[in-house]
Amino acid sequence: MSGGLDVLALKEEDITKFLACSTHLGATNVDFQMEQYVYKRKPDGVYIINLRRTWEKLLLAARAIAAIENPADVCVISARPYGQRAVLKFASATGATPIAGRFTPGTFTNQIQAAFREPRLLVVTDPRIDHQPVTEASYVNIPVIALCNTDSPLRYVDVAIPCNNKSVHSVGLMWWLLAREVLRLRGTISRDHPWEVMVDLYFYRDPEEAEKEEQTVVEKPAVKSDEVQDQWATTDIAIQPPQQEVSDWAAESIPVAPPGQPFMPPPAKDWSASTTEDWSAASGPAPQSALNGRWHLRNWG
């Protein structure tokens, strides 16, 4: 299909991506309809997929998707957890309608339910896992494009893209390549320049690993601040208090705490407390006449 045009030929960088993501590795079993896409069989029993046939079917699927006038009429589905992020990214890039997660039975056939849809094209990640939408698509004459492994059933599948649909990186790469080819056929991006969107954005990320990465990023600055505080605590810096110039020499001296000890203010004086003094010792005993006179005055009132 793409042998006559150099623009559509398989590039070396794309082959490198295929091999790095293990797209060429199939399963240990093979369906009789998938034998035409098998290149060889390894000694351990794993079938090797012909990547040239994979690329040709990928271009055919991209042409079918680009031929739909309204991008929202293309429905992309993935019930597998590691294909849901790729489906959502593909839908945001091309404008398709995503169904990530469980497919509600009757979405294509039951007109009463609120989630009823009438798409013109269906793209699924695995025809074995997504058998319900594939079966319903056959009832209402919707063409189906599927990412198929060597052991995938091809019943009701119109365009089968042979690849490894059980690998996290392989599924993300196939959706990324399909989105790139659709945008190139629509004229949104140029073939002369590489697509600025990275393949890593289409890969599945485990929520637990993502939380661990966020926690490590948050904990790193806190550890650094604790280390700085420990360094300042261990280093002994002798700080000499500044000498204050005293212009009034009659003033009291300013107490200065020695280095390494906290400063303690001088005790406050209690001006209300009166000092006890023995006035009788200085003045002597009172005269007897005064005491007698005071006695008589008290008696006579």
Curated annotation (Swiss-Prot):
Its main location: cytoplasm. Residues 256-268 have a biased composition (Pro residues). The keyword Metal-binding does not apply. It is found in: Cytoplasm. PROSITE patterns: RIBOSOMAL_S2_1, RIBOSOMAL_S2_2. Residues 256-301 are annotated as: Disordered. GO terms for cellular component: cytosolic small ribosomal subunit. GO terms for molecular function: structural constituent of ribosome. It comes from the Eukaryota. One of its GO terms (biological process) is ribosomal small subunit assembly. It holds the Pfam family Ribosomal_S2. Keywords: Cytoplasm, Ribonucleoprotein, Ribosomal protein. InterPro entries: Ribosomal_uS2 (IPR001865), Ribosomal_uS2_C (IPR032281), Ribosomal_uS2_CS (IPR018130), Ribosomal_uS2_euk (IPR027498), Ribosomal_uS2_euk/arc (IPR005707), Ribosomal_uS2_flav_dom_sf (IPR023591). Disulfide bonds: none annotated. PANTHER family: 40S RIBOSOMAL PROTEIN SA. Component of the small ribosomal subunit. Mature ribosomes consist of a small (40S) and a large (60S) subunit. The 40S subunit contains about 33 different proteins and 1 molecule of RNA (18S). The 60S subunit contains about 49 different proteins and 3 molecules of RNA (28S, 5.8S and 5S). Interacts with ribosomal protein S21. NCBIfam families: uS2_euk_arch (TIGR01012). Belongs to the universal ribosomal protein uS2 family. Required for the assembly and/or stability of the 40S ribosomal subunit. Required for the processing of the 20S rRNA-precursor to mature 18S rRNA in a late step of the maturation of 40S ribosomal subunits. This is Small ribosomal subunit protein uS2. It comes from Pinctada fucata (Akoya pearl oyster).
